[in-house]
């Protein structure tokens, strides 16, 4: 429910919402629509930006402790977490990343905003295609890390043993 994924997992944002619209949204999520009146409030928008960056730093620290891999907190996080199936677009996302990778290999000076693709998935034990897609994601991650001129602009990480604790960190 929204209380777990907003209030518990994102206490900074919950505190801002409490200040701006009160605590009623915690029981009645429809009240979150009241936050729209702050869409042009520069002070609130700056606090949102700061909250987002602090949360990215928290996740980066969590991920680094868990895997030893660091993530650029100034990069755009593109997150796709769900059970892996051929039809759930993970493969399409991987093919898009390969396209970006090839463009950056051709032109390392290409002006792109650094982006971190974060995958988390589980595959059913007998679902070989899903396991192969996970292998492809991991191979692409290693290839990007070994390519100078690309690794500073593009990163792919795979969250192994994805669970609720990891989801809450995200």
Segment roles from a protein language model:
Residues 1-170:
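Catalytic cores of carbohydrate-active enzymes across secretory and cytosolic contexts
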């Amino acid at each position: 429910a929204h209380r777990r994924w907003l209030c518990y997992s994102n206490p900074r944002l919950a505190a801002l919402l409490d200040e701006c619209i009160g605590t009623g949204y915690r029981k009645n999520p429809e009240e979150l629509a009241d936050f729209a009146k702050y869409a042009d409030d520069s002070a609130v928008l700056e606090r949102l930006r700061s909250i987002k960056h602090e949360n990215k730093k928290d996740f980066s620290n969590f991920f680094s402790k868990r895997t030893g891999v660091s993530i650029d907190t100034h990069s755009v996080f593109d997150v796709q977490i769900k059970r892996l199936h051929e039809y759930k677009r993970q493969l399409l996302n991987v093919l898009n990343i390969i396209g970006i990778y090839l463009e950056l290999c051709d032109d390392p000076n290409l002006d792109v905003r650094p982006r971190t693709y974060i995958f988390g998935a589980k595959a059913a034990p007998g679902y070989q295609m899903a396991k192969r897609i996970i292998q492809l994601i991991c191979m692409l991650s290693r290839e990007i890390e070994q390519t100078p001129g690309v690794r500073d602009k593009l990163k792919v990480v795979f969250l192994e043993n994805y669970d609720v604790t990891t989801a809450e960190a995200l």
